[in-house]
Amino acid sequence: MSMVYFNIFMAFTVSFVGLLMYRSHLMSSLLCLEGMMLSLFVMMSMTILNNHFTLASMAPIILLVFAACEAALGLSLLVMVSNTYGTDYVQNLNLLQC
């Protein structure tokens, strides 16, 4: 494994660990998800370019489309929660609490 792939994999791992550790705030969870998507995009693009997979060249663009949709939905949820409750705690999203 080259050093570039290792660094991108470490970026994904750090984002994933950040998602697990800082899951109490919605904004930090969204930032960690975006970091994971960015590292996946770079890893997928580099793999496709290095291995000359011409049939899979659309996959990184499709991943970016899904990441943009995820970001838009996450930010709209963040705005709704912060307007309703005044904070961005994820525990406010639990519908089973009274």
UniProtKB/Swiss-Prot annotation:
Transmembrane segments: 1-21, 29-49, 61-81
Location in or out of the cell: Mitochondrion inner membrane
UniProt entry keywords in alphabetical sequence: Electron transport, Membrane, Mitochondrion, Mitochondrion inner membrane, NAD, Respiratory chain, Translocase, Transmembrane, Transmembrane helix, Transport, Ubiquinone
Any one Gene Ontology BP term: ATP synthesis coupled electron transport
InterPro entries: NADH_UbQ_OxRdtase_chain4L/K, NUOK/Mnh_C1-like
Cellular compartments per GO CC: mitochondrial inner membrane; respiratory chain complex I
Entry EC number(s): 7.1.1.2
Topology class, membrane: Multi-pass membrane protein
Main localization of the protein described in the UniProt heading: mitochondrion
Reaction catalysis annotation: a ubiquinone + NADH + 5 H(+)(in) = a ubiquinol + NAD(+) + 4 H(+)(out)
GO molecular function: NADH dehydrogenase (ubiquinone) activity
Role, per record: Core subunit of the mitochondrial membrane respiratory chain NADH dehydrogenase (Complex I) which catalyzes electron transfer from NADH through the respiratory chain, using ubiquinone as an electron acceptor. Part of the enzyme membrane arm which is embedded in the lipid bilayer and involved in proton translocation.
Quaternary organization: Core subunit of respiratory chain NADH dehydrogenase (Complex I) which is composed of 45 different subunits.
Protein family: Belongs to the complex I subunit 4L family.
Protein name: NADH-ubiquinone oxidoreductase chain 4L
Gene name, Swiss-Prot/TrEMBL: MT-ND4L
